[in-house]
Amino acid sequence: MLTSTSLYAAIDLGSNSFHMLVVREVAGSIQTLTRIKRKVRLAAGLNSDNSLSAEAMERGWQCLRLFAERLQDIPQPQICVVATATLRLAVNAGEFIAKAQEILGCPVQVISGEEEARLIYQGVAHTTGGADQRLVVDIGGASTELVTGTGAQTTSLFSLSMGCVTWLERYFTDRNLAQENFDEAEKAAREVLRPVADELRKHGWKVCVGASGTVQALQEIMMAQGMDERITLAKLQQLKQRAIHCGRLEELEIEGLTLERALVFPSGLAILIAIFTELDIQCMTLAGGALREGLVYGMLHLAVDQDIRSRTLRNIQRRFMVDTEQAHRVADLAVNFLDQVEDKWHLEPISRELLTSACQLHEIGLSVDFKQAPQHAAYLVRNLDLPGFTPAQKKLLATLLLNQTNPIDLSSLHQQNAVPPRVAEHLCRLLRLAIIFASRRRDDLVPQITLQAQDENLTLTLPQGWLEHHPLGKELIDQESQWQSYVHWPLDVH
């Protein structure tokens, strides 16, 4: 039963948007129940004396009246409300906060830039997979947080006075999207970054993760345009040229960019280009969570799981009553196959991880029905919350599960953008073979199999006499060989 004691709420009064996240604690992880976001653009109401206008304050209070209704069902100790950059700056912040507390019926805490950076990092550490040593970037409305860390521990924290709303007001006042506007915005951002760049570089990182609306917008653009999800400087420069070509902010049209995000997109883009250039970032991906998730996990006192993806897979297996022994059996066999062909097929470590994940989830469709189980599995993966996996990785997993058996839908493997199409094909082939040879659901009945790859030709060698003694197995592998040949995947079985 859902009781109010299992509910938690985190509210972030940001400089661009106000956000509310309501979650339920379920077996050591969180289940999102409500997410509300309203563009309040508080920072746009700051004048040259750092005084908030009455209109901006009213926009904020109006939004909080919406939030207040949802908070009535949640115990006050389980509500955390924080205010960030604009309310750190505003000389009349006290007036805004007093009324905000009255509306919400709970305290509002103005947090320091360093505390904001720490919470953002915690949110990322709890929800984002990948290497342990990371750089986290969050471009807010009036401040930008940059944090390095390993696992759950931060190694450096910086909160800088630049954001997509303040940069919009300062460098795109006339709403022109000219090269000069971008040049000035980038130059100013690099000057703000310069004093902290050495310290960040000293700590180093293996992966760079973006946790802001700007990065979310970039992700949406790249998914809509069929690009892979990695953000690179070349892609950012390409989007800048597109924006310049549009000429004015009100004319800005980029496939995948929503109207809601368009206003602060150019200013956020300029800041991000400056960060990439100044810190020599090669590639960035989108974080699974940030400030609000950091607040929630902080209230719950949950430890950071060393492997977020594994935790996610375990939770889903439990929820859909997956036969975990069989899932591990298929995964072990698929990894054994991958070990034999990875050099010839040039498969990277992430391919191994994604193949294993697909194996762990391949039978979740059975919880709906045996009929069309692959379609059910794909639907579930597409629509479940999978902390630790990026949107593109979710799409790849769903596509692999859709193609785990029966005729192969090659176009779906080519439409995902987590890995190159050829790699998706290779992973699909290995998954399908592992499922066939583990189908008896007993370790002692899995034969010794040798796989050899030569370009797209796959040669599968079985123990002598195995095919004669296993007529059903032979039928399955003959059918598989035929299905693979339909999509020009030669499979020879000996």
From Swiss-Prot:
Pathway: Purine metabolism; ppGpp biosynthesis; ppGpp from GTP: step 2/2
E.C. number(s) listed in UniProt: 3.6.1.40
UniProt keyword list: Hydrolase
Catalytic activity of the protein: guanosine 3'-diphosphate 5'-triphosphate + H2O = guanosine 3',5'-bis(diphosphate) + phosphate + H(+)
Keyword Protease in annotation: no
Role noted for this protein: Catalyzes the conversion of pppGpp to ppGpp. Guanosine pentaphosphate (pppGpp) is a cytoplasmic signaling molecule which together with ppGpp controls the 'stringent response', an adaptive process that allows bacteria to respond to amino acid starvation, resulting in the coordinated regulation of numerous cellular activities.
Protein name: Guanosine-5'-triphosphate,3'-diphosphate pyrophosphatase
Gene source species: Citrobacter koseri (strain ATCC BAA-895 / CDC 4225-83 / SGSC4696)
Lineage: Bacteria, Pseudomonadati, Pseudomonadota, Gammaproteobacteria, Enterobacterales
Gene this chain is encoded by: gppA
